[in-house]
């Protein structure tokens, strides 16, 4: 792991950095560098290096954000460059995609099966799956029932400490409880506090019956019991702040 150059593809020229200085919103922040990782190992190296150098990191997919979520004056990590794999499963009943895949192209891939993904944001032909998960995309047609949160089966993610987790593997729940015991205990404590407060429990249930993208997906504490499942669903709508 080369912490001085954590990624093969690093853009540092002024014109390159200016090209990534804004997204679809009105904000302008010029990144110190734009990194385009190809592997999980490079992402781990970026996270480790940023911690040592004390440089903030912002991950960006399609850059269709309207509120400045995908701009930074630190290191901008562009995952839309290389992470574009789309794989249909079970005759199109499920689809496994990387975060740089454009939503519209995923639907085009599924069209022959008569299927499409749940979220249908207006930016679907530009927005990428990573961003759609990060802001819990929905749309005019899918509503809440088929938003990103409710149509997620499993997710593979990297924590800021570099550890990799894959919720499609049944053994991961036990490993998560073992290696992330403190985090698990805190998640379960929050869940117990919510379940023990009838008015708060009712409020969370009511609030998430309609589109709600303010803050973290607190309904994860109500919908799931296993810490890894709670955490993985907190990632949906977390704007990349957790993993």
Predicted regions and their residues:
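Beta-rich nucleic-acid/ligand-interaction surfaces
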Residues: 124-130
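N-terminal glycine-rich flavin-associated loop
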Residues: 25-57, 75-122, 133, 137-189
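Conserved phosphate/anionic-ligand binding catalytic regions in large, soluble enzymes, centered on
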Residues: 63-66, 132-140, 228-243
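Short glycine-biased active-site loop of nucleotidyltransferases that positions the nucleotide triphosphate
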Residues: 25, 66-71
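N-terminal accessory segments
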Residues: 1-25, 30, 49-57
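C-terminal substrate-recognition/cap domain of FAD-linked oxidoreductases
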Residues: 11-20, 220-228, 232-243
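Polyanion-binding loop/helix "lid" in catalytic or ligand-binding cores
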Residues: 190-229, 233-234
């Amino acid at each position: 792991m080369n912490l001085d150059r954590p990624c093969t593809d690093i853009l540092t020229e002024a014109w390159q950095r200016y090209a990534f200085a804004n997204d679809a919103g009105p904000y302008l922040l010029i990144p110190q560098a734009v990194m385009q990782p190809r592997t999980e190992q490079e992402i781990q190296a970026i996270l480790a290096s940023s911690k040592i150098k004390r440089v903030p990191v912002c991950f960006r997919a399609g850059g269709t954000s309207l509120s400045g979520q995908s701009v930074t004056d630190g290191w901008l990590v562009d995952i839309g460059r290389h992470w574009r794999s789309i794989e249909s499963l079970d005759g199109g009943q499920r689809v496994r995609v990387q975060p740089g895949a454009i939503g519209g192209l995923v639907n085009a891939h599924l069209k022959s099966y008569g299927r499409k993904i749940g979220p249908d944001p207006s930016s679907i032909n530009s927005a990428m799956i990573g961003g759609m998960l990060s802001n819990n995309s929905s749309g005019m047609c899918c509503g809440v029932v088929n938003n990103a949160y409710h149509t997620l089966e499993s997710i593979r993610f990297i924590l800021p400490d570099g550890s990799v987790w894959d919720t499609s593997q049944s053994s991961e729940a036990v490993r998560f409880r073992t290696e992330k015991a403190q985090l698990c205990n805190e998640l379960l404590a929050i869940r117990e506090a919510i379940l023990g407060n009838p008015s708060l429990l009712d409020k969370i249930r009511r609030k998430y019956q309609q589109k709600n993208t303010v803050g973290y997906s607190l309904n994860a504490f109500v919908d799931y019991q296993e810490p890894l499942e709670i955490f993985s669903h907190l990632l949906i709508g977390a704007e990349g702040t957790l993993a």
